[in-house]
Every structure is written in structure tokens, then in C-alpha cells.
């Protein structure tokens, strides 16, 4: 489960494109906190810190405790915009989170213990991944960093379905339980056949001289 992270912010009185450009010139990123039955709160964040948070991974699945004007607001990033040329953050949208609320998040799927899967280790099969991420409806306090799929004992022909995924308590998936997450498939070319073909191509043809 992702830990709640502290984040310092400064309240913004002015909004609009001109005000946003002025904020960026000061080395900060304009942002807004909305939802929770309250009026939107315009804030600004440190640009360097925001850049590191976005590119550090898991930004959109992390709950932040934002301190602004002596108040602490729990919120989760819903979206952010990047400069199309410099890839620097231009704006961040946060959603307030409250007790009993659930949020929709995209969580990565990690496939673990691949060396313990006979279909991959001994038979040189391939893991054909259909879903690298899955959409969860989950409590903000229970958002996982990732959903791990254990491949121990998996062989060629085995399929991992959505119903096989281990979810946090109270979480639900938007996908059909019977939908495929990944399958173990045979190698494109069998290792032995590929090796024999390589040897055949490398060996010079024998010729017999008649004397």
C-alpha cells in the first residue's frame, strides 16, 4: 500500500493563464484541489519537487497530505499537464479524499517469480501480457503500489485471468473476471530447432574428389 506523503503548497489568489505564467516564472507549478463537496482551492507547488514526484513513478496512485495556509488537505492527483517540448510540469489537478470514499486508479501489474515458471525457465516460453495495468475502485488508504502475479509453477498454455488477481480488501475491478491478463505461449522458434538450423547453415558442404 502506498504511504501518504506530505506536500507543501502555497495558496493562489489569482487564476487564469496570465497568473499561471507568473507562477511558473517563480519556479512553481500551478495546481488546484477540487471535490469533496467544497470549493476548488488554487495552489502552487515547487517545480523541482513536482518534477521528481511525477517522474519518480506512482504519482497518480499516491495520496498526499497537502499543507497550505496552515491547513492539511488529503488529496490524490487526478491529472497533470507537461510542456510538450521540455516535458516540465505545467499544471496538476488534485481530488480531495474523505473517509469512506473510493477512487478510481490505474495500478501496474507485476509478474513475479518468472524463474520458477517451467514454461519460461525450462521451456523458453514467452509471457504474453495483455494488461500491464488494471483499473481499480479502491479506498485511498488501500491503494497498492502494484498488483503482483505469482508465476511459480506456470507452464506453457497457462492463462492468468482477472479473477486470479489478489486485490486489497474492499477493492473492485472494472474488468470482466474472465478477461485474460497474461498467457504463457511457446517460443517463436524452439531452442533445439534453432540451434540445429544454425549449425546446418554454418557447416560447409562436403565435396568428394574423384582421383
Swiss-Prot record:
Keywords: Ribonucleoprotein, Ribosomal protein, RNA-binding, rRNA-binding. The keyword RNA-binding applies. It comes from the Bacteria. InterPro entries: Rbsml_bL25/Gln-tRNA_synth_N, Ribosomal_bL25/Gln-tRNA_synth, Ribosomal_bL25_b-dom, Ribosomal_bL25_C, Ribosomal_bL25_long, Ribosomal_L25_dom, Ribosomal_uL5_bac-type. GO terms for cellular component: cytosolic large ribosomal subunit. One of its GO terms (biological process) is translation. CDD domains: Ribosomal_L25_TL5_CTC (cd00495). One of its GO terms (molecular function) is structural constituent of ribosome. The keyword Mitochondrion does not apply. Belongs to the bacterial ribosomal protein bL25 family. CTC subfamily. This is one of the proteins that binds to the 5S RNA in the ribosome where it forms part of the central protuberance. Part of the 50S ribosomal subunit; part of the 5S rRNA/L5/L18/L25 subcomplex. Contacts the 5S rRNA. Binds to the 5S rRNA independently of L5 and L18. This is Large ribosomal subunit protein bL25. It comes from Methylobacterium nodulans (strain LMG 21967 / CNCM I-2342 / ORS 2060).
Amino acid at each position: 500500500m502506498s504511504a501518504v506523503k506530505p506536500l507543501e503548497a502555497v495558496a493562489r489568489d489569482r487564476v487564469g493563464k496570465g497568473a499561471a505564467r507568473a507562477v511558473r516564472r517563480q519556479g512553481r507549478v500551478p495546481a488546484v484541489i477540487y471535490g469533496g463537496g467544497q470549493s476548488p482551492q488554487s495552489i502552487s507547488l515547487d517545480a523541482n519537487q513536482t518534477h521528481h514526484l511525477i517522474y519518480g513513478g506512482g504519482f497518480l496512485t499516491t495520496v498526499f497530505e497537502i499543507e497550505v495556509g496552515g491547513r492539511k488537505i488529503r488529496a490524490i492527483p487526478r491529472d497533470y499537464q507537461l510542456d510538450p517540448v521540455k516535458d516540465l510540469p505545467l499544471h496538476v489537478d488534485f481530488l480531495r479524499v474523505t473517509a469512506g470514499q473510493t477512487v478510481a486508479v490505474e495500478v501496474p501489474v507485476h509478474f513475479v517469480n518468472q524463474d520458477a515458471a517451467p514454461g519460461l525457465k525450462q521451456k523458453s516460453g514467452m509471457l504474453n501480457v495483455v494488461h500491464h495495468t488494471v483499473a481499480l475502485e479502491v479506498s485511498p488508504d488501500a491503494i497498492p503500489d502494484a498488483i503482483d502475479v505469482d508465476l511459480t509453477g506456470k507452464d506453457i498454455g497457462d492463462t492468468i485471468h482477472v479473477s486470479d488477481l489478489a486485490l486489497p480488501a474492499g477493492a473492485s475491478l472494472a474488468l470482466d473476471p474472465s478477461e485474460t491478463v497474461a498467457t504463457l505461449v511457446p517460443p517463436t522458434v524452439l531452442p533445439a530447432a534453432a540451434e540445429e538450423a544454425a549449425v546446418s547453415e554454418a557447416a560447409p558442404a562436403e565435396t568428394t574428389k574423384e582421383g
